[in-house]
């Protein structure tokens, strides 16, 4: 089924604006996606019609809010193939979900000398929490080197894997190059050694249909804001036995059965990990975003994104002094380096022409160090981008190169 791109673009009010005298070309969707009107409306409708604290009180508004909130949890469970909504923990995003796993599961199970294997290609959110818990427990974070082309070092991983390894952490799809990592092979090998696997799905959830049971993933996390949903809402999926054995990491209301000065008993899943008032509007809007995204032909969306990436890559490859780091065909990301030019300068010149890209290290210092660069200009496509926008990008790059 072909995508009706005009109809899709019309649903995104942010794309209708003028930036620096030019129509906005938004090419930063790997950082955060723009939001369709239905998601914006879902937030507005909640606050104008159903605003109430969930799981508390007996009035109609709280009953309506709770129904929508828990309905959203059920929808997320179905979206990723989880066995139950009890396996879905609401968080502020993938970063908080990874920290929850580190401070609850890892801190309560790791011992001195244990190892946590982490890919060199990871976002800082999937490195720093493991370093912190390693310091707390005496465990050791071990780097899985990437290949020279920026791919997951599967051979190196197999050599590093040993009975000392208790946790393996890697992204489903990397955020700098768009590399799809071999999570199935990693999960299988890790499980054979008795290790659990944590998958950062912040990028992967957008581009693949995820079935956590088919993957046999122990933990899978993602953020709503990269999936056309609002910022501030995220998801932690965990296997039931793991979640049940994990201690709460935050204390407060909602996550308790009984509180007294003699001691406190905690509620079961998922509530014991959700202390305090949750982001009700964010959860409801995430469910709306999932509905919206599933209404599209996902295969057609990915084909469209790959076509845009290929169009851009072919044109950029012809430009002297610009190179693409770790190019991955059939992705939706390109990371560029211009010899002798700071990435921020190139991005600024593009912004002056209405082209929004990301410049920096993309929260991936180890990957940048491995490539021998300080940062890149990252171009990342969303469902709303067009071939005409790629043409504008290329023209803007040529103009920037002439100025630099």
Curated annotation (Swiss-Prot):
Determine the domain of life of the protein's source: Bacteria
**Chain positions found as N6-(pyridoxal phosphate)lysine:** 226
Question: Has UniProt tagged this entry with the keyword Transferase?
Answer: yes
Question: Which GO terms label this protein's molecular function in UniProt?
Answer: cysteine desulfurase activity; pyridoxal phosphate binding
Task: Provide the cofactor list for this protein.
Answer: pyridoxal 5'-phosphate
Where is the catalytic site? Answer: 363
CDD domains in the record: SufS_like
**What Gene Ontology terms for biological process does this UniProt record contain?**
cysteine metabolic process; iron-sulfur cluster assembly
Q: Which reaction does it catalyse?
A: (sulfur carrier)-H + L-cysteine = (sulfur carrier)-SH + L-alanine
Q: What is its EC number?
A: 2.8.1.7
Recorded hits in SUPFAM superfamilies, A to Z, give: PLP-dependent transferases (SSF53383)
Pfam families named in the record: Aminotran_5
Q: Which UniProt keywords apply?
A: Pyridoxal phosphate, Transferase
Role summary: Catalyzes the removal of elemental sulfur and selenium atoms from L-cysteine, L-cystine, L-selenocysteine, and L-selenocystine to produce L-alanine.
Which family would the database say this protein is a member of?
Belongs to the class-V pyridoxal-phosphate-dependent aminotransferase family. Csd subfamily.
Q: Which NCBIfam families match?
A: FeS_syn_CsdA, sufS
Official protein name in the record: Probable cysteine desulfurase
Organism in which the protein naturally occurs: Vibrio cholerae serotype O1 (strain ATCC 39315 / El Tor Inaba N16961)
- Organism classification: Bacteria, Pseudomonadati, Pseudomonadota, Gammaproteobacteria, Vibrionales
């Amino acid at each position: 089924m072909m995508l009706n791109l005009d109809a899709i673009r019309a649903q995104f009010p942010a794309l209708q604006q003028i930036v620096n005298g030019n129509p906005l070309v938004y090419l930063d969707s790997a950082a955060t996606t723009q939001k369709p009107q239905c998601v914006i409306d879902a937030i507005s409708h909640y606050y104008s019609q159903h605003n109430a604290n969930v799981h508390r009180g007996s009035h109609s508004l709280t009953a309506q809010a709770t129904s929508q909130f828990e309905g959203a949890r059920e929808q997320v469970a179905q979206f990723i193939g989880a066995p139950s909504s009890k396996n879905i923990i609401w968080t502020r995003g993938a970063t908080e979900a990874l920290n929850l796993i580190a401070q609850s599961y890892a801190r309560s199970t790791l011992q001195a000398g244990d190892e946590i294997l982490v890919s060199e290609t990871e976002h800082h959110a999937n490195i720093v929490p493991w370093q912190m818990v390693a310091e707390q427990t005496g465990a050791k974070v071990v780097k899985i080197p990437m290949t020279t082309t920026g791919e997951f070092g599967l051979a190196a991983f197999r050599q590093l894997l040993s009975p000392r390894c208790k946790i393996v952490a890697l992204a489903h799809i990397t955020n700098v190059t768009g590399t799809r990592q071999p999570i199935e092979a990693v999960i299988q090998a890790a499980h054979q050694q008795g290790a659990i696997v944590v998958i950062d799905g912040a990028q992967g959830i957008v581009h693949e249909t995820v079935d956590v049971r088919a993957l046999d993933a122990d933990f899978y996390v993602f953020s709503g804001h990269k999936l056309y949903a609002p910022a501030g809402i995220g998801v932690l999926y965990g296997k039931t036995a793991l979640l049940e054995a994990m201690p709460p990491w935050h204390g407060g209301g909602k996550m308790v059965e009984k509180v007294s000065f003699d001691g406190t008993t905690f509620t079961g899943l998922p509530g014991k990990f959700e202390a305090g008032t949750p982001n009700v509007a964010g959860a409801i809007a995430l469910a709306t975003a999932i509905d919206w995204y599933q209404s599209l032909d996902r295969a057609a969306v990915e084909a469209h994104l790959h076509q845009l990436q290929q169009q851009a890559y072919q044109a950029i490859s012809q430009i002297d002094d610009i190179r693409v780091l770790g190019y991955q065909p059939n992705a939706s990301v390109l990371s560029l380096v211009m010899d002798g030019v700071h990435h921020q300068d190139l991005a600024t010149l593009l912004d002056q022409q209405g082209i929004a890209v990301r410049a920096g290290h993309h929260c991936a210092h180890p990957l940048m160090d491995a490539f021998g660069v300080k940062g890149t200009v990252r171009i990342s496509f969303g469902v709303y981008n067009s071939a005409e926008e790629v043409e504008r990008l290329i023209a803007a790059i040529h103009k920037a190169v002439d100025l630099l």
